[in-house]
Amino acid sequence: MRGALNVYQYLGPLILGPLAAWAWVAHYGSWVPALPALLVPVIHAYVVPAVGTNVLGMWEFDTQVKLGKFRPHHGFVFGSATALIAWPLIGAPLPAPNPAAALASALRVGLVLLAVNWAYDAVALKSGILKVYTPAAARGAGPWRAAADYVVPFFGLFGVIYAGGLRLAEPWLAGAGASGAALVTLGLAAACILISSASYVAGSYLVYGHAGLKPGLRES
């Protein structure tokens, strides 16, 4: 399994990235409104894990190519797959604001991303390509439980914000131009990062009584 994950981390983005770009451009009819759908997962997957690995020491990648504890291509590994997974779930572009449709899309994408990424991280933890030092991991939990400390905010809630934000922005994005798409991309990425991170801290306080921002037991 480790060998397959090692191959996927390089081959996956090379295949899934162009497929995701083609799918979203076809979905919206041009590159400009497709940019937030393609770039927000990449930005999220660079900022959150980079801080979690090299600043807080909560995660670590055991790969040949690393910057500190972080693999420099991780944003594209997560981002390309996430954009492609979300594409068939998002629904037809909205010509006018429709909060109910946005919520339905948000829940669909959030639940699927939670399930897929929880399974992926559990396999990655079991194979050793990913290491986590969450409170559950420090207590000797297995891969699924160790990943449970962070998967809901950083995958599930991220998917809700990402998809819901895209749907709410669609009517405006249709005529906003490149500057508008850039604004939506940055604003939505910031919302995903800040809200999911705050949710992780809040959940850790509820379960463990602390922020969950200090690494637990490490291998000697």
List the predicted regions and their residue ranges:
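Aromatic-rich, lipid-facing transmembrane alpha helices and their immediate juxtamembrane interface loops
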Residues: M1-S220
